[in-house]
């Protein structure tokens, strides 16, 4: 199985696209089976079926509601692997250990 990440920002164009690339690089280097997509906060509900983890800045993460086996990771600096990396890995290792190589 592959853990599916959705990067969310206010407009879905700038920050989430960069965050998508940073998360992809980080998870590839961490040997995690994954896919990463991005969208605007207003579109996240239509993208939930294809995501296991939603990653967003802390102020946007508070607006995101999920149910079931889906998780939201709020980060202060969504462009810094030093900030989002440990939080994201913690959720993956706890809830998606089969994706850690």
Curated annotation (Swiss-Prot):
Catalyzed reactions: N(pros)-phospho-L-histidyl-[protein] + L-ascorbate(out) = L-ascorbate 6-phosphate(in) + L-histidyl-[protein]
Domain PTS EIIB type-2: 1-100
Location relative to the cell: Cytoplasm
Induction: Induced by L-ascorbate. Repressed by UlaR.
Cystine connections: none
Active site residues per record: 9 (phosphocysteine intermediate)
An example Gene Ontology CC term for this record: transmembrane transporter complex
Any single biological process term in GO: L-ascorbic acid transmembrane transport
UniProt keywords, alphabetically: Cytoplasm, Kinase, Phosphoprotein, Phosphotransferase system, Transferase, Transport
Coiled coil region boundaries: none
Single GO MF annotation: protein-phosphocysteine-L-ascorbate-phosphotransferase system transporter activity
Keyword set includes Magnesium: no
InterPro entries reported in the protein's UniProt record: PTS_EIIB-like_sf (IPR036095), PTS_EIIB_2 (IPR013011), PTS_EIIB_2/3 (IPR003501)
Null allele phenotype: Cells lacking this gene are unable to use L-ascorbate.
Phosphocysteine: modified positions: 9
Superkingdom to which the source organism belongs: Bacteria
E.C. numbers: 2.7.1.194
Job of this protein: The phosphoenolpyruvate-dependent sugar phosphotransferase system (sugar PTS), a major carbohydrate active transport system, catalyzes the phosphorylation of incoming sugar substrates concomitantly with their translocation across the cell membrane. The enzyme II UlaABC PTS system is involved in ascorbate transport.
NCBIfam families membership: PRK10222.1
Domain observations: The PTS EIIB type-2 domain is phosphorylated by phospho-EIIA on a cysteinyl residue. Then, it transfers the phosphoryl group to the sugar substrate concomitantly with the sugar uptake processed by the PTS EIIC type-2 domain.
Name of protein: Ascorbate-specific PTS system EIIB component
Name of encoding gene: ulaB
């Amino acid at each position: 199985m592959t853990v599916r990440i959705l990067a969310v920002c206010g407009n879905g164009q700038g920050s989430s696209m960069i965050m998508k690339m940073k998360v992809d690089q980080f998870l590839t280097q961490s040997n995690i089976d994954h896919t990463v997509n991005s969208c605007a906060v207003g579109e996240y509900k239509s993208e939930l079926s294809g995501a296991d983890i939603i990653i967003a800045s802390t102020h946007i993460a508070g607006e995101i509601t999920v149910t079931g086996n889906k998780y939201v990771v709020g980060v202060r600096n969504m462009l810094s692997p030093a900030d989002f990396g440990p939080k994201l890995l913690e959720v993956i290792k706890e809830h998606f250990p089969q994706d850690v190589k």
